[in-house]
């Protein structure tokens, strides 16, 4: 069975009514998984008790479900993290996962996240979202056209250095600017691994504070992730270190160990392709 790894940490906002202990903050990331496989979903539950402070909620029961699929559950650890392996549908497409918690006082935190189910034999293109025009300044017309051409026969994922709390709004901005749909991942995420302990050797996810690149793990699940599109030397270096060929838009200097193809502009990329 294939397994996908946590992809990004999209801030999900306050997800419950106010109670005596404050509001819940439930963080649920975008998910990407191979069709018919499973996604190991890592979420975090906090409580907004002291204005900007948000202490972790420990030993909270979390429920995970995609549509009418099997229900999975896990308890949060001392950092507020909980993880569960959730089976995804056989049919590729964008599905919805619901993550929820109900406490003893009747306060509930619930969030939906997008689950992108992909055919692992299909090509995947990665794009540095931070270089796209139209999200902050400039016109998105040429860049959006170029990316729409890229996703003909391929899947697309976005990578960003932005704070995770902006990912949900970024999805809306991308859509309004005419860019194709795809999961938003942070360039790096917390490192985590699975251990088996206790008398029954049940699997448990341990989340560590150190950050690691997402791309190598994504490539293990989707081996046809082969191309990265960007306009900066830093992003080009990250793509090359993960073994991707680089398509550089513009004239920024770049020294990479993999194939480098240059396009003078987004309109040039739209006309020539990658």
Sequence positions of predicted segments:
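Bacterial N-terminal signal peptides
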Residues: 8-16
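Beta-strand-enriched, solvent-exposed domains that form extended recognition/catalytic surfaces
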Residues: 20-120
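Asp-based phosphoryl-transfer active-site loop
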Residues: 123-138, 239
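Structural beta-sheet core signal
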Residues: 127, 158-160, 228, 248
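Second-shell loop/turn segments in exported
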Residues: 132-137, 158-161, 200-204
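Short, acidic loop-to-helix structural element flanking the phosphoryl-transfer center
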Residues: 135-157, 164-171, 209
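C-terminal cap/substrate-recognition subdomain and adjoining C-terminal extension
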Residues: 166-274
